[in-house]
């Protein structure tokens, strides 16, 4: 519990109030809660103050656009309403105070970049558990103690949700947490008051331009994690063009590369010298500031070599002995919906992956090719009401790397599926190897029944998701379940 006057440094109210939780959604308010009314992109929380009071809110903090109103207190009945200037910007700091700075008592690692955030955050938590920690994770798949993850709405939750979750993890015994930090979360200051032991940058490719408007804005949002927030250790993928540029500006950052010829300069470093890919993963010979060795990876694809090196480098920077990391790496497992392989005797191999950007799709197809002796199939779609510019680019990638392509439905939302297909098809030079099957289950069925034993079918776009968003309705759908049904 936190007292209202202590939270806002207010002069003593006549009757100070003890608050149980901070709540942004008026529908979730309970007696004793502090309702936070901020102006979001779609709705203004101030419109729901009456609803929050009806549900028993003990106090309200309300965003105001007038600096002169900052920390003034009004009353609705007996309930104090504290006006707060630029509340959304400062909400992370307020929640940090409310929940007693939970990130100070956790080893917190933030992971940002277009692709790889989920795999890296999950691997960090998994590896920390193997090293004897109680780990938690927050991100696209969900939030919770490792092995007890609950589905989440957004990659990076609200400023309040993040602080309250970290507090809950701490009280549940966690001492290590990895969190995916999205560009939206950074641009909207949702992680502003967190204390990061380390931050990892994976890569930057086209995504979310419907929100950021330009790649420059997108990169600037990501960069804040390394230049403006409380981040101790910075681990950067040097093979990414933006990452390489940032390394020239961040002399204390650690450089990680898959290029044996990478010139390390003055940075601490990790680089792969030789990589042997095989059906069960890869064997990575590496050299680093912490020593040399061979890392046995259970993950498929070159991009997962990069992901694993970024994770191991971060743990090495924390002081874990190299020999301990190499020994425990053998027990690591893949991540749900991330290059997840499904195999049955005498059937084509199916790989389910979350790839939903041109770069991610290219990397997934290249990785799938390494395990393909026959034809490579690609099933994909593009989300509705989202960046239309990437749709023809996805088609170009699929046409370049796959022999057979099926365009299908992938969360059309309120947009016409035929319009989405038209945008995608504009990227193909030749439609001979392309089929359009809007029903995703039928698309998967057709591919599995048409492909032969040595073929590989990449089902891209949904990964761990078990739903389709059609109109405003969320319908149960799992690529894995459908694939298994038709493979059996």
From Swiss-Prot:
Q: What's the EC number here?
A: 6.3.2.13
**What GO cellular-component annotations does this UniProt entry give?**
cytoplasm
The pathway entry for this protein reads as: Cell wall biogenesis; peptidoglycan biosynthesis
**What's the chief localization of this chain?**
cytoplasm
* Reaction catalysis annotation: UDP-N-acetyl-alpha-D-muramoyl-L-alanyl-D-glutamate + meso-2,6-diaminopimelate + ATP = UDP-N-acetyl-alpha-D-muramoyl-L-alanyl-gamma-D-glutamyl-meso-2,6-diaminopimelate + ADP + phosphate + H(+)
Q: Which residues bind ATP?
A: 113-119
A GO biological-process term: peptidoglycan biosynthetic process
**One Pfam short name:** Mur_ligase_M
Needed cofactors: Mg(2+)
Locations listed in the record: Cytoplasm
Source organism of the structure: Haemophilus influenzae (strain ATCC 51907 / DSM 11121 / KW20 / Rd)
Q: What's this protein's name?
A: UDP-N-acetylmuramoyl-L-alanyl-D-glutamate--2,6-diaminopimelate ligase
């Amino acid at each position: 519990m936190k007292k209202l006057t202590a939270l806002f440094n207010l002069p003593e109210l006549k009757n100070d109030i003890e608050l149980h939780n901070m709540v942004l959604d008026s529908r979730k308010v309970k007696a004793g809660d502090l309702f936070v009314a901020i102006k979001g992109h779609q709705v203004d929380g101030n419109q729901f103050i009456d609803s929050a009071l009806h549900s028993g809110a003990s106090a309200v903090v309300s965003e105001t656009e007038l600096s002169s109103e900052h920390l003034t207190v009004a009353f609705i009945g007996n309930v104090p309403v504290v006006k707060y200037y630029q509340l959304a910007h400062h909400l992370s700091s307020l929640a940090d105070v409310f929940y007693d700075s939970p990130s100070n008592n956790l080893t917190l690692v933030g992971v940002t970049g277009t692709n790889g955030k989920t795999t890296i955050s999950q691997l960090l938590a998994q590896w920390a558990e193997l090293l004897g920690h109680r780990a938690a994770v927050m991100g696209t798949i969900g939030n919770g103690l490792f092995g007890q993850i609950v589905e989440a709405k957004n990659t990076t939750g609200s400023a309040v949700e993040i602080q309250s979750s970290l507090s809950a993890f701490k009280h549940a015994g966690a001492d290590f947490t990895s969190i995916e930090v999205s560009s939206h979360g950074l641009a909207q200051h949702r992680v502003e008051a967190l204390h990061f032991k380390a931050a990892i940058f994976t890569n930057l490719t086209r995504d979310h331009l419907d929100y950021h408007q330009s790649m420059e804005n997108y990169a600037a949002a990501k960069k804040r994690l390394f230049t403006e927030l409380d981040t101790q250790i910075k681990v950067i993928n040097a093979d990414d063009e933006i990452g390489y540029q940032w390394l020239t500006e961040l002399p204390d950052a650690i450089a990680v590369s898959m290029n044996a010829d990478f010139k390390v300069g003055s940075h601490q470093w990790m680089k792969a010298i030789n990589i042997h890919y095989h059906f069960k993963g890869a064997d990575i010979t590496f050299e680093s500031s912490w020593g040399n060795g061979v890392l046995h990876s259970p993950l498929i694809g070159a991009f997962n070599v990069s992901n694993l090196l970024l994770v191991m480098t971060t743990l090495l920077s924390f002081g874990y002995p190299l020999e301990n990391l190499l020994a425990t790496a053998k027990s690591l497992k893949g991540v749900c919906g991330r290059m997840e392989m499904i195999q049955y005797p005498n059937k084509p191999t199916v790989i389910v992956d979350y790839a939903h950007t041109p770069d991610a799709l290219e990397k997934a197809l290249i990785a799938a090719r390494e395990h393909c002796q026959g034809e490579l199939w690609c099933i994909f779609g593009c989300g509705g009401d989202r960046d239309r510019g990437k749709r023809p680019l996805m088609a170009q990638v699929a046409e370049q790397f796959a022999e057979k392509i099926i365009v299908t439905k992938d969360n059309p939302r309120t947009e016409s599926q035929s319009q989405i297909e038209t945008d995608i098809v504009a990227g193909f030079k030749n439609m001979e190897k392309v089929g359009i099957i809007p029903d995703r289950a039928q698309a998967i069925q057709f591919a599995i029944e048409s492909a032969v034993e040595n073929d590989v079918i990449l089902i891209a776009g949904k990964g761990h998701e078990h739903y389709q968003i059609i109109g405003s309705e969320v319908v149960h759908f799992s690529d894995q379940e459908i694939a298994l049904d038709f493979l059996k």
